[in-house]
C-alpha cells in the first residue's frame, strides 16, 4: 500500500472536484471511493460506513431543528421579532442597524441558519433601512454579518452535527456555550455599526418606552418560548436534544398556523417540501463524510496534520491562530456542514493537545465557518444578501470590511478566553 498516493488521491481529488464545482457530497464520495480503491479496501465497507454515519440518535435532531426553523421562519415571526428588537434598541444612534443585529440574535435562536436569517429578515429590514436614510450597502452588510449570530445561538443543527462528529459531546453543553459568544458577536457588530452610524449621521429611532417593550415582548413570547422549550428541556435533563426538537416542531406548527396565522395548511406542505430538500443534502453529506473520515483515520492523516502544524511552532498561541487560519481558508471554499464533518476529526486532536476544550473549539469552528459564509468565492450568505438588496457583490463586500474586523476580534476573544464559551455550561451543567 502506498500511503502517500492514497492521501494524494483522497485530499487532492477532493480539492480538485471542489474547484471543478462538483457538489460537496459528490466530491467527498468520489474521492473517498478512489482512495479506497487505491488502498485496496473492500468497497463493501462503503455502504456499512454510510449507514453507520447517519445511524445516530443525536443526529435525528437535525431534521427536526431544520423543520422548526422553516416553520417559524415562514410563519410570520420575522415582523414580530423586528418590532421587539425595535422597542429595545431602536432609540440608539443607527437605531435600525441595532434593530437588525438584535433581531438576528432572536431569530437565530429559532432558525439556526444564517441563510434563512438573511433571506427572511433582510427582505424586510434592508428596504426599511434604505427608506429611513441608511445606505443600501451598509444595510446589507449589517444584515449578512449579524446573521452569523444565529449559528451560535441555540438551537442550531450545526451544533448537533459538530457534537456528533467530535465524539458524542453533550449537545446541551454546546447549546449553552453559544449564548455568550453570540452576544459578544452582536455587541462587537453593534459597536462597529454605532461608529459608522455616528460618522454618517444615520438617524435614531423613537425614545425607549418600557410599556412598548413589554407589549412587544408579550406578542413575541410565543416564538421565543420555542427556544426555552428546547434549551431548558435539554439542559434540565427533561428530554434529549432529539426529543426536544420533535416537541419544538409540533409547537412551531401550532404557533405558526393557529396563533400567528402566518401559514395555512398549503403553506405547511410547501415548507415541509423545502425542508426535505435541505435535509436530503445534509444527510447525504453526513453519510459520505463518514466514509471520508474513515479514510482519514486509516491513513493517519490527523496524526500527520498534528505533526505538521506543531513542527511550525510549539507555541500554543501560534497553533491556535493557525487553526483559525485553516478554518477561515476552508470557509472561503466550502460550506459549513462539510467543514464541520471533514475538518473536525483532523483539527480537534490538535486543538485539545494545546488545551482548547472540545466545546470551545466547536464555537471556534462555527464562527470561522460563519465568516466563511460571508466571503467569496463560495459565500452563500453574501450572495443571498446581494440578491435581496439587488446590489453588486463587490459593493457589499466593500461595505462589509469593517464588520469583518468586528467578527475577527470576537473570534480572537473566544479563542484566547475559554470562559466566554465554557462559563455558562460549567455553571448550569455541573
Predicted segments, located by residue:
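Alpha-helical transmembrane segments of multi-pass membrane transport proteins
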Residues: 1-430
Amino acid at each position: 500500500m502506498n500511503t502517500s498516493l492514497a492521501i494524494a488521491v483522497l485530499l487532492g481529488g477532493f480539492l480538485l472536484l471542489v474547484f471543478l464545482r462538483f457538489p460537496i457530497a459528490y466530491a467527498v464520495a468520489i474521492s473517498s471511493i478512489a482512495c479506497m480503491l487505491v488502498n485496496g479496501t473492500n468497497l463493501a465497507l462503503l455502504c456499512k460506513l454510510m449507514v453507520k454515519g447517519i445511524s445516530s440518535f443525536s443526529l435525528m435532531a437535525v431534521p427536526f431543528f431544520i423543520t422548526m426553523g422553516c416553520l417559524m421562519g415562514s410563519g410570520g415571526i420575522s415582523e414580530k421579532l423586528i418590532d421587539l428588537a425595535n422597542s429595545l434598541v431602536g432609540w440608539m444612534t443607527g437605531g435600525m442597524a441595532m434593530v437588525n443585529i438584535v433581531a438576528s440574535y432572536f431569530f437565530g435562536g429559532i432558525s439556526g441558519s444564517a441563510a434563512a436569517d438573511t433571506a427572511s429578515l433582510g427582505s424586510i429590514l434592508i428596504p426599511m433601512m434604505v427608506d429611513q436614510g441608511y445606505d443600501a450597502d451598509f444595510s446589507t452588510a449589517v444584515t449578512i454579518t449579524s446573521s452569523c449570530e444565529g449559528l451560535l445561538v441555540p438551537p442550531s443543527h450545526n451544533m448537533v452535527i459538530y457534537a456528533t462528529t467530535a465524539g458524542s459531546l453533550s449537545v446541551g453543553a454546546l447549546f449553552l456555550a453559544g449564548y455568550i459568544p453570540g452576544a459578544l458577536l452582536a455587541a462587537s457588530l453593534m459597536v462597529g455599526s454605532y461608529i459608522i452610524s455616528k460618522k454618517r449621521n444615520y438617524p435614531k429611532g423613537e425614545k425607549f418606552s418600557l410599556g412598548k417593550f413589554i407589549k412587544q415582548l408579550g406578542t413575541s413570547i410565543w416564538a421565543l418560548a420555542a427556544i426555552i422549550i428546547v434549551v431548558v428541556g435539554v439542559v434540565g435533563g427533561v428530554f434529549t436534544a432529539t426529543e426536544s426538537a420533535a416537541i419544538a416542531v409540533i409547537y412551531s406548527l401550532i404557533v405558526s398556523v393557529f396563533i400567528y396565522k402566518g401559514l395555512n395548511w398549503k403553506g405547511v406542505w410547501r415548507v415541509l417540501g423545502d425542508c426535505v430538500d435541505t435535509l436530503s443534502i445534509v444527510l447525504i453529506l453526513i453519510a459520505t463524510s463518514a466514509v471520508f473520515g474513515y479514510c482519514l483515520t486509516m491513513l493517519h492523516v490527523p496524526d500527520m496534520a498534528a505533526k505538521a502544524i506543531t513542527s511550525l511552532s510549539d507555541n500554543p498561541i501560534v497553533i491556535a491562530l493557525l487553526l483559525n487560519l485553516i478554518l477561515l481558508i476552508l470557509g472561503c471554499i466550502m460550506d459549513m456542514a462539510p467543514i464541520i464533518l471533514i475538518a473536525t476529526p483532523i483539527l480537534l486532536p490538535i486543538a485539545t493537545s494545546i488545551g482548547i476544550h472540545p466545546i470551545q473549539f466547536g464555537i471556534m469552528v462555527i464562527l470561522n465557518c460563519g465568516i466563511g459564509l460571508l466571503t467569496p468565492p463560495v459565500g452563500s450568505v453574501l450572495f443571498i444578501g446581494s440578491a435581496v438588496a439587488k446590489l453588486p457583490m463587490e459593493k457589499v463586500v466593500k461595505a462589509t470590511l469593517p464588520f469583518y474586523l468586528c467578527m475577527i476580534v470576537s473570534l480572537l476573544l473566544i479563542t484566547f478566553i475559554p470562559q466566554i464559551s465554557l462559563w455558562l455550561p460549567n455553571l448550569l451543567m455541573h
